[in-house]
Amino acid sequence: MSKVNVNKVVVAYSGGLDTSVIIPWLKENYDCEVVAFVADVGQGAEELEGIEAKAKASGASECYIADLKEEMVADYIFPTLKTGAYYEGKYLLGTSMARPIIAKAQVEVARKVGADALCHGCTGKGNDQVRFEGAFAALAPDLHVIAPWREWDLVSREECLDYLAERNIPCSASLTKIYSRDANAWHISTEGGVLEDTWNAPNEDCWAWTVDPEQAPNEAETVTLKVAKGEIVEVDGEAMTPYNALVYLNEKGAKHGVGRIDIVENRLVGMKSRGCYETPGGTIMMEALRAVEQLVLDKASFEFREELGLKASHLVYDGRWFTPLCKSILAASEELAQDVNGEVVVKLYKGQATVTQKRSDNSLYSEEFATFGEDEVYDQSHAEGFIRLYSLSSRIRALNSQKK
């Protein structure tokens, strides 16, 4: 494929080996100015330390750092939580939810500096290339997109390190990298290494955040969450922003080994991959929201929310955040969440987050009607007519069979 003419490109920069190579490679192969863009999505202070200097040492003319933590949790994670989305029944979409806001902010920087191209460091095997480029297509269809991993002939970490050494570009990366990790305020994912063989149990170093449940405290701890319109607004009696609530619950959950999963998932590009994911605070939040939903959503609404969650999980995973369908699902979930108000107590113990108490002013649960003892509010004889109508089609089908 022939290269397009590019004057200025904004690259999503992490400070790692791949993107450190990408900056000089872009300058050499596209003869263009390179602007680095760094998204702070809660990956940690260590990852961001000195990152502007690293980018410029690699050849970037400028480096923009955007603090996206609050916006990511409030405008991307919380709306997704309201849908009840779990990808393939387990994954709380930690990497997937971070990509659209990173891409959006990258486009904003490109507009600000007058760039005519965008660049990402995703490989040609993974989901992220689709997520980034899908977002770019929706937000900036006029900008060129460069994906070096689909163009260059570098195939190993050793070759990447040699590339930088030949150009006297400093890099702290080592030749040996056991795992591939992605981190943000919501989760940490770990892939590769021993995990590539599904018969290998995860080593303890596969987990970067949470305490081994077997080594977690022997005494349970409880947290109390207040929910308003499907969002966590207060934890343990203190009003908190979405991000601060997540940080607080992450600390509590990680201490007790909450939020670990080991999953083999179907990637968008067709292959399967295995990963160990840690989502301590998110797991607690999801348990609390589901508990309130059990109280306030009627049967039809709950079933519909389940359907929304399934569809939303695939849309978010597949990089279709900026689509009319995703927007519609989020809007429907927002409407269903209007009555999702209440208070929940969650017990944290040895890797488990268990709801032990829940209440809501909007609750459809009535102790008077639900009692298994004697009551005066429900005439059980009324059930007979309902059952005859409810089973009418089965009765007619059986009668037809008897006539044959």
UniProtKB/Swiss-Prot annotation:
It comes from the Bacteria. The keyword Cytoplasm applies. It catalyses: L-citrulline + L-aspartate + ATP = 2-(N(omega)-L-arginino)succinate + AMP + diphosphate + H(+). One of its GO terms (molecular function) is argininosuccinate synthase activity. Its main location: cytoplasm. It is an enzyme of class 6 (ligase). The keyword Membrane does not apply. Pathway: Amino-acid biosynthesis; L-arginine biosynthesis; L-arginine from L-ornithine and carbamoyl phosphate: step 2/3. InterPro entries: Arginosuc_syn_C, Arginosuc_syn_N, Arginosuc_synth, Arginosuc_synth_CS, Arginosuc_synth_type_1_subfam, AS_cat/multimer_dom_body, Rossmann-like_a/b/a_fold. L-citrulline binds at residues 91, 96, 127, 131, 180, 189, 265, 277. Keywords: Amino-acid biosynthesis, Arginine biosynthesis, ATP-binding, Cytoplasm, Ligase, Nucleotide-binding. Belongs to the argininosuccinate synthase family. Type 1 subfamily. This is Argininosuccinate synthase. The gene is argG.
